[in-house]
Amino acid sequence: MTALITQFWQQVETALKTANPQEKCRLVNDLYDNLLPQIQLIKLEDFPEIVPQDNIAAFPEKPLLVAPKDVPKRSFATEEGYAATLHAIAHIEFNAINLGLDAAWRFGRNAQEELGEGLAFVKDWLRVAREESTHFSLVNEHLKTLGYQYGDFEAHAGLWEMAQATAHDIWERMALVPRVLEARGLDATPVLQEKIAQRKDFAAVNILDIILRDEIGHVYIGNHWYHALSKKRGLDAMKCFTELLHKYRIVIFKGVINTDARIQAGFTQHELDWIYEVEQTLKSYIKK
């Protein structure tokens, strides 16, 4: 591993270990814009060897993290409730920065070993982290115009808990974080934009336009690597995905399905129909 590659991975680790949101964003932007273009990751030895229990991602002291059921429900019609909604988006984006960094750091070596495409994998997930840092900054700055900032409301750790649950396997991570958790945002964002437009906060609507556009690309990246890994491992991508949904007791569709966005993000209509049918039985299974 050359000195430049060592410096690169040290900054990836530093960004992951940084709790301050603004400093984390600065480090991520520098990583993607300045360091990444200078390196070539060719050999397996160019990637760090990570074990599943390694977890170095840092989070700020605030927001206070609680169980999803314990996040206070506030009316969207009130200023505080509206700010809490934007805060929830900022929290998702902050977690997504760590998810992009962690994927590159944790699984780059696996992508090189299994597919011979470690550099492409690292570039993809650092691009995700870079764009998520922009999303976080946009939402947090807008939140400040309402008199609030990131950390002012409680939040939950559901997104990161799934990252920890899939820390042992690049294939499971690609299957469940971008294709399930991040893809839900494709469905939810247009509905939320309509509600925000009724408040005439068109700056927030425009921010969500940027987020939706980029998230389509992020889910596409997840789909690409999931299918590449499934093919390499000789797995039936749809059948095995169904088994994962049962294993983790996950329901994907929670309301309106944004079919157009999901297809742009790499799902096929056949796959979406398959998942929908599977979920009808899965919902009954989960209720038992």
Curated annotation (Swiss-Prot):
It comes from the Bacteria. InterPro entries: DUF455, Ferritin-like_SF, UCP012318. It holds the Pfam family DUF455. This is Uncharacterized protein HI_0077.
